[in-house]
Amino acid sequence: MSFPRGSYDPAASNSSPRWPLSAEDANSSREAAGHQKGSDPSGDVRNEELAKLEIAVLAVIFVVAVLGNSSVLLALHRTPRKTSRMHLFIRHLSLADLAVAFFQVLPQLCWDITYRFRGPDWLCRVVKHLQVFAMFASAYMLVVMTADRYIAVCHPLKTLQQPARRSRLMIAASWVLSFLLSTPQYFIFSMIEIEVNNGTKTQDCWATFIQPWGTRAYVTWMTSGVFVVPVVILGTCYGFICYHIWRNVRGKTASRQSKGSGEDVAPFHKGLLVTPCVSSVKTISRAKIRTVKMTFVIVTAYILCWAPFFIVQMWSVWDDNFIWTDSENPSITITALLASLNSCCNPWIYMFFSGHLLQDCVQSFPCCQRMVQKFTKDDSDNMSRRQTSYSNNRSPTNSTGTWKDSPKSSRSIRFIPVST
């Protein structure tokens, strides 16, 4: 994360360090190094060791995110199965994660390499807009996917009323809303002349606010829109989902107990007839709860990855005792950079909960296909040999003794299982 310091004073200036509200838009290695070491008379220097660490982390995140999400999209494209609503949401969440990689991580990686933003004013505004757009898209796509799981579990009859159309409308709304909410970046960020250590002036892509409290308002709004509000919605949806599943399972259990005791009555709770909202507990457990678990893991990963970043952002603008050199701590810097690790985790979560996606992904590559075929052939040969050996050992002709004279043995031989 970048916390440019230098001559910036929140009490005396309305210009803000490049607050992108994206973990990658941060070079915590900037001006403070020159202030601490005084090795460069121009003052526009940075902590090179920390900068190298940032560049390495961003490069790894970019490569892993691109490979993982591209593999998921390729597997979804090649899968012979009929595309479900969950696959539709996974596809668009992978696209949102690719947007994070290309619009957020990659520009910041280039920015860290060049130290200062190298480009015209319009490019500065576009980059800042796309960085925040990717953040909104990733968060809101997760919200609509969780909302779809809530509808599927708590209101199953609604899934019969044009479910594909509703899902596409929800996805389109999340993309459009993300684009609109990130549009103010065009008016907040621009190429301006900033003063660094020792009075040196340079051009960089920074945010400018009319009022001194603008930075606090901006960071608080972005934290609420990208993190707090989505987390509240996600928590509410999962609260209803868990309550509904618990009530359904309890009703089914009470119904089975009543049937076992010979009572032909449905269970009552507080004078009301308790009837399960879904036809079968097994159906919930195997189909819907698996996708609910997958979405829950994705939500948990999102919170764990992004919470440290937003905590540091809020701390830096609301704590009057905060100094920019605090962000020179490598642990703070890397913790903030790891926010985009969420885009790397999601593909593996999809593949873990949808085993066929991993198989379809592997089959997309010829080299992996040959390896799978070789292992499958070896396993098939080994299984055939084991089956033949097992059958021969169980055959009466290979047995000793008077098995024909023993009716008990003769009857038992008929029921000896032979694996197929």
From Swiss-Prot:
Transmembrane region(s): 55-75, 93-113, 126-146, 169-189, 226-246, 295-315, 332-352
GO cellular component terms, semicolon-separated: plasma membrane
Basic and acidic residues biased stretches: 32-45
Compartments, as annotated in UniProt: Cell membrane
GO biological process: cellular response to hormone stimulus; male mating behavior; positive regulation of vasoconstriction; regulation of systemic arterial blood pressure by vasopressin
Composition bias, Polar residues: 385-403
Additional record remark: In prairie and pine voles, the 5' regulatory region of AVPR1A contains a microsatellite region that is virtually absent from montane and meadow voles. This species-specific microsatellite polymorphism modulates gene expression in a cell-type-dependent manner and generates a great individual variability in the brain expression pattern. This polymorphism is correlated with monogamous social organization.
Protein's name in the database: Vasopressin V1a receptor
Source organism of this protein record: Microtus montanus
Originating gene: Avpr1a
